[in-house]
């Protein structure tokens, strides 16, 4: 058995030498090295400067060609210096516009508010309404509400009352005034007691009544 050992050792040494890392250099795998360098670098696009233009989607346009870039609805022209795009002065959108479309180069109002809002309710253009007994309102064409508040006349009595659905106070018993603590009707003389006769001032209901007190004896007027 002894004479065969040296031959086995020689075979093992030969195999180790064949797979030694030190024996493999970069020049042995040029294709793999190039692939690795390409993977580590960013993808390089063709340079179209002075030759054409590229939009956001990667489409190439020739010099002088008109196109619409992805980020804008305004047309552009491809030049040697790059895209030159139209930038028109767009008209202002109406402040009452409720629907705006951006399909064209300029935004366009497609629907204008055609009603008025007042105290949580909506009204048609030119519609008249009364939000309260004392107000008369109308929805104007400019979508604004114009109201007029009733200008009530001064009541000619000291005890006016407010009726439901009526704006201004009324004197249910007609004009009157105070004679002391007593309310007397206007226009006539009123005997407030056995010795006193009172009369309201004509048209001046807020003034105390004019009273004439006669001479009395034991609470009875003397003639």
UniProtKB/Swiss-Prot annotation:
Does this UniProt record's set of keywords contain Secreted?
yes
The record's section on Pfam families has: VWC2L_1st (PF23333), VWC2L_2nd (PF23334), VWC2L_C (PF23331)
PROSITE patterns cross-referenced by the UniProt entry: VWFC_1, VWFC_2
UniProtKB keywords = Developmental protein, Repeat, Secreted, Signal, Synapse
| Coiled-coil region | none
Is Signal there in the keyword field? yes
Residues making up the signal peptide according to the UniProt record: 1-21
Gene Ontology cellular-component terms listed: AMPA glutamate receptor complex; extracellular space; synapse
Q: Where does it live in the cell?
A: Secreted; Synapse
Where is the VWFC domain positioned along the sequence? 51-110, 114-172
Gene3D superfamilies, alphabetized: 6.20.200.20
The main location is secreted
One GO biological-process annotation of the entry reads:
negative regulation of BMP signaling pathway
Q: What does this protein's UniProt record list under function?
A: May play a role in bone differentiation and matrix mineralization. May play a role in neural development.
Q: Which PANTHER family match?
A: BRORIN FAMILY MEMBER, VON WILLEBRAND FACTOR C DOMAIN-CONTAINING PROTEIN 2-LIKE
Q: Mind telling me what this protein is named?
A: von Willebrand factor C domain-containing protein 2-like
Q: Which organism is it from?
A: Danio rerio (Zebrafish)
Lineage of source species: Eukaryota, Metazoa, Chordata, Craniata, Vertebrata
Gene encoding the protein:
vwc2l
């Amino acid at each position: 058995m002894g004479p065969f050992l040296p031959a086995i050792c020689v075979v093992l040494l030969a195999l180790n030498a064949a797979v030694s890392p030190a024996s493999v250099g970069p020049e042995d795998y040029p294709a793999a090295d190039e692939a690795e360098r390409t993977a580590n670098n960013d993808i390089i696009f063709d340079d179209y400067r002075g030759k054409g233009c590229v939009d956001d989607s990667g489409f190439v346009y020739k010099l002088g060609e008109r196109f619409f870039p992805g980020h804008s609805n305004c047309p552009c022209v491809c030049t040697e210096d790059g895209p030159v795009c139209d930038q028109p002065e767009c008209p202002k959108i109406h402040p009452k516009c409720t629907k705006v479309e951006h399909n064209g180069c300029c935004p366009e109002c497609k629907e204008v508010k055609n009603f008025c809002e007042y105290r949580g309710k909506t009204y048609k253009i030119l519609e008249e309404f009364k939000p309260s007994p004392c107000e008369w309102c109308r929805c104007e064409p400019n979508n604004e509400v114009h109201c007029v508040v009733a200008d009530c006349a001064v009541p000619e009595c000291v005890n006016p009352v407010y009726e439901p659905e009526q704006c201004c106070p009324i004197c249910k018993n007609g004009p009157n005034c105070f004679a002391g603590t007593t309310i007397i009707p206007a226009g006539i003389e009123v005997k407030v007691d056995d010795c006193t006769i009172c009369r309201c001032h004509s048209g001046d209901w807020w003034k105390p009544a004019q009273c004439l007190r006669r001479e009395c004896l034991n609470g009875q007027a003397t003639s």
